[in-house]
Every structure is written in structure tokens, then in C-alpha cells.
Amino acid sequence: MHAKSLTELRAALAAKECSAVELAQHYLKRIDAARDLNAFVHVDADLTLAQAKAADAELARGAGGALTGLPIAHKDVFVTRGWRSTAGSKMLANYESPFDATVVARLQAAGMVTLGKTNMDEFAMGSSNENSAFGAVKNPWDTNAVPGGSSGGSSAAVAARLAPAATGTDTGGSIRQPASFAGVTGIKPTYGRVSRYGMIAFASSLDQGGPMAQSASDCALLLNAMAGFDERDSTSLERDDEDFTRHLGQPWAAGNDAGKPLAGLRIGLPNEYFGAGLADDVRATIDAALKQYEALGATLVPVSLPKTELSIPVYYVIAPAEASSNLSRFDGVRFGHRAAQYGDLLDMYKKSRAEGFGPEVKRRILVGTYVLSHGYYDAYYLQAQKIRRIIANDFQEAFKSCDVIMGPASPTVAWDLGAKGDDPVQMYLADIYTLSVSLAGLPGMSVPCGFGAGANAQRPVGLQIIGNYFNEARMLQVADAFQRATDWHKQVPAGV
């Protein structure tokens, strides 16, 4: 049962081959048996089965929609009533929210059944899921490797088939990079497309929620429920509702030959994504995927994104600056861990934050406070914002000659657990291909397209697909065409 995609599970429920309760029980058993992966931080079988029973009642009445009764796991950055909501931090280790995040509420309203909360890098700050207060997550493909981050628990859960789908968030690549490392499909929508209400904030001008699942078609189904205007989120964009599945299985242009469904599609290949720093095995795998697109009728077009390298320093000025402000609320008074012993109020603030936050979060708070301080604001923060606008303009220039942009989601396959923990700069460099997309607010996704070579032969590679603003439906169409022609997204780790 767990090998089935969301679409296949929906058909199984409709045909009464299984019930929502049976589905939930099956996945709960798998989660319990795979505790060593550490993908989940909180599971409550009673809450899950109660939701499943309600879904079965809906289905029995002939009601319900496309997602009714289907299980999903939520990244622990989305507050979820009934489950703990920790953001992977000791600071919120015992926090229980009195309300659901909009993303959670919409998926529950669509009839989905929550399996539990997935592990993550603390406050979504990290690229390996080693920064969690609840321990590192292991990659199901190779348990000596990281699953990516910060949505590593979600990517590992979907890869190990502990859940058919999961929510994630992406600030600088935290859906796309773990999707690449774990061999699953994940999409970061256009900034403002999915509500941030109830999503514990890291960097408010960058954070965006999105789905992770086996396939592009599954992600499209989930995005139908997740996306939409929310008046409680000041960054939410008012757009007409759309069906993200509407182009799936359709030719790129009317009249295309069945063997060349993507004829007319122009794929931009940034020179900067294929230069120094890209591992040879990743390059070979991406090249093979691009040849598959050519076989489907697409045309490859060279483009340039000249400020790609600057995306790293720009991101690591802007994101920590916003984080230092957002995380100031966690002081042990109203929110977060409070030190057991302290002398006065100031001492309580110091000790509570020192005990509650992990090393990477402290590092970014310090960086953010520095770049916002008097004398440095103009030199760092304002300059970073100017370059951010240039990066966004570079993408618009590139889209004049192509419909989508493609390249690797990460310069390497997943690295070994502990390999980069002592060198944060090396960890930051792993996001070079995803950061600029986030800075521009564009939609991007990663789809499985093969594996590394040699010692990395069991470590997945993801192809990144980047679209222009609000072009998710076309991006999903392009990804779906690739997945109809290949089976990389159907492959699973040994033993699964």
C-alpha cells in the first residue's frame, strides 16, 4: 500500500480497497518501525485515527474531495493544534498551539489525515537537518548521509514511504535541496502564493510553504488545497483560484506529436549553474535528464544569471537580519523556554535564550544583529537589498528567451552526517543554486533524475525547474512530462 502515490491511494479509497483508518494504521506502523531514521518528532495515533474515522464517515456519505482520507505529515514549523509545535528547537520543546496554521487547516478541511510532525533544522536554519534539538535525521537511501534541510524530516518520511506526502517550507532551498537529496518531488511556490499564517517565522520576506510527495502530479493536487489568499497573512497575494493539475498530461502546445509533447518548450540553462563547484556525477546526471527533455521535444537555450555567486552573501545578510528580529519574541516571558535559575530580568533573558537556542541559530542571530546595527545597516543590509533586486531582474531578462530554467538543485549529492558541521560556510555553499530563486520570490521545484556515481551510487540527484512568477501549473506540467517518460520518482531505498 505504501508504494502507491497519492493519486493511486485516492483511487484505492474510491474503490473501497481500503479505508482511511486502515491507511492511517498502515503508515503509523511504518513510522514506528522506522524510528531510527528520526524523521518524526511527534506522533499521536489517537488524534490521527480520529481524523481518519471522520474521513471515512465523509466518504461513506458520498461526500469528500480529492484528498479526503489521504495521510500527510507536517513539518514541525507549522503550528498544529493537538500536536506539539517545536520548530526543531529546545526553545519550543513543549509548545502546543491553540490554533492550526492556515496550511494545516486547509489540508484538514480538504479531508487529509495528519500522521504527525516531522523533524527539521532548528527554526528552519540549516541544510542538513543536523541542527535539530531532537537529533539528526538519516537519509533513507544511505543512513550515513544527511537528508538535506531544513525540511529533512519531511523528505526522509516521503522517501522511506512513511507518508505519501508532507509539507515543507523553503526560505533558501529548504524544500528543493532535501527533495533532491532524498529522491522525492518538492515545489516552492511563488512567494505569497501559500499563506505563512501559523508558520513559525525565520525570514519573513523569503519563507514559503509547499508540498513534498512522490510525483509532480501529487504535488499539484496538494497545491490545489494549500494555495490561496489569506487575510491573516500580510504577504499573501490575492489571485484567482486555479487548478494546478490542469496542464498535466497535456502537450506543451496544441497539435504537438504524441512522441514530442514538449515541442516548443524552451529550457534555459544558466552558464553559472554548470561551472566550477558542480560535482562531475551530478553534472552527468543532470545532462542525461536534459537529453530526455530534448527527446520529448524541448529546446535547450543558454542563458545567464550573472549574480548567482552573490546570492550567498546577499542571502546570509538578509535572512539573518530578519531572523534576529523574528526570534526576539522568544525570551522566556510569553514564548519559549525559561531558565530555571536567574538573578534578574536581564539575566533571565540571557540564560533562557542561551539555553533555548542551538549554535546555528545563535550564529545567525548574531550576524543579523550586526548587519542591522548602527554604522553597518547601509553597508550591508541596504546593499544586499539592492543586489537582491538585480538578481530578480536577471531572472526576468533570462525568461525573455526561455519558458523555464533548469539546472541542478544542489552542486553535490547528500554528504555524510557530520561532514560539514564544523564548517558553516561549506554548508552555505551547498545552497548556491536555490538561494537566488528564493531571493527573487520565484517558484522552483526539484524532481528526482538519477543518482551519483561510485561511492555515491545510492544517493539521489534532483533536477531543479524554475518558473516565472505564478507559473507553477506550467512547471508542474514540465515535471510531469519527465516523470511520465522516466521512473526515477518511483524508485525507493533498499528495504522499503
From Swiss-Prot:
Q: Which reaction does it catalyse?
A: L-glutamyl-tRNA(Gln) + L-glutamine + ATP + H2O = L-glutaminyl-tRNA(Gln) + L-glutamate + ADP + phosphate + H(+)
Query: Which PROSITE patterns does the annotation name?
Result: AMIDASES
The alphabetical list of record keywords is: ATP-binding, Ligase, Nucleotide-binding, Protein biosynthesis
How is this protein annotated for GO cellular component? glutamyl-tRNA(Gln) amidotransferase complex
| Entry GO MF terms | ATP binding; glutaminyl-tRNA synthase (glutamine-hydrolyzing) activity
Which EC number(s) does UniProt give? 6.3.5.7
Q: What class of enzyme is it?
A: ligase
Single Gene Ontology BP annotation: translation
Q: How does it assemble?
A: Heterotrimer of A, B and C subunits.
The record's PANTHER family line, in alphabetical order, gives: GLUTAMYL-TRNA(GLN) AMIDOTRANSFERASE SUBUNIT A (PTHR11895:SF151), TRANSAMIDASE (PTHR11895)
Q: Which HAMAP family match?
A: GatA
Q: What is this protein called?
A: Glutamyl-tRNA(Gln) amidotransferase subunit A
Q: Which gene name does the record give? A: gatA
